[in-house]
């Protein structure tokens, strides 16, 4: 899976204006000008260095009578794919936006199966940004430091991260863990592009198997959900299967993987035993960390 990490990216989405900023704005439609930030603790979207969006990224914007209008990043800025958003009167308009763009819009189906584990399911949502003909800059940014609202992009999914370490009697010098299977989660659901909300639609748990390909870190994007059974981990190493039962989150909600939170497990393989840390909750948002032990 291609993983992209980032700390925080400020981006300007400039929509071609039909009027100069200093002109009389009552003479006709005025093109909106968008700016946007991704919440600073976000850590999976955008480029591998975690510093910027990638050309070709597409967001959907709704507001001022426009619904699900795609804007694509090209040469460092977001431009309308085929339609420009204009202010057609002097009233203040409110805008929402989401990533990644879905042509059908509305409530879309989501699968978090192993073959879907990429940025295409790392849904982001921003809301409440306003603008008008007199202030055409619509700012999807965090304004709380100035006493305003947080209108920046936030994660809508949850994230489980693993770091695999060699313990007593184990060495990764010649071979690393091949992969792992996680059981106890549901992987089918929906995302609402209008509200940024998710829902689980699967009625039963499905195991997910991830290949490590020589890496000792991995992550799984999941739908936010309550876990009602044990969360079992099997790690394949040197022809053996090491097993552990993971401790479920205690915060912010017990036994629940919460939207916007990342839960990190440190998995240590010892001779015939795995030790798994308490899940540490890290950006995206602060959270839990856990240890557990697993045996052959």
Role assignments for model-derived ranges:
Residues 2-296:
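Sec-type signal peptide cleavage vicinity
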């Amino acid at each position: 899976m291609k993983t992209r990490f980032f700390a925080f990216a400020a981006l300007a989405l400039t929509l071609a204006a039909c009027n100069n900023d200093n002109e009389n704005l009552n003479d006709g439609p005025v093109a909106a000008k968008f700016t946007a930030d991704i919440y600073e603790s976000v850590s999976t979207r955008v480029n591998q260095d975690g510093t910027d969006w990638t050309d070709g990224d597409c967001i959907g914007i709704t507001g001022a009578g426009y619904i699900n209008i795609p804007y694509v990043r090209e040469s460092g800025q977001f431009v309308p794919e085929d339609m420009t958003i204009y202010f057609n009167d002097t009233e203040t308009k409110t805008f929402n936006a989401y990533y990644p763009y879905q042509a059908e819009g509305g409530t879309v189906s989501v699968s978090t199966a192993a073959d879907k584990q990429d940025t295409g399911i790392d849904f982001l949502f921003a809301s409440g940004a306003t603008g008008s003909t007199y202030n055409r800059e619509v700012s999807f940014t965090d304004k709380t430091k100035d006493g305003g609202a947080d209108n920046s992009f936030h994660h809508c999914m949850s994230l489980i991260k693993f770091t695999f370490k060699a313990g007593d009697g184990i060495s990764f010098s010649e071979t690393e863990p091949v992969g792992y299977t996680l059981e106890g989660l549901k992987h089918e659901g929906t995302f609402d592009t209008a509200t940024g909300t998710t829902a689980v639609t699967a009625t039963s748990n499905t195991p997910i198997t991830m290949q490590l390909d020589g890496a000792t870190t991995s992550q799984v994007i999941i739908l936010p959900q309550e876990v009602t059974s044990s969360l079992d981990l099997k790690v394949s190493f040197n022809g053996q299967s090491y097993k552990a039962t993971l401790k479920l989150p205690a915060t912010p909600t017990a036994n629940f993987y919460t939207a916007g939170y990342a839960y990190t497990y440190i998995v240590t393989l010892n001779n015939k035993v795995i030790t798994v840390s308490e899940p540490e909750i890290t950006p995206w948002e602060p959270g839990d960390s856990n240890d557990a032990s697993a045996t052959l």
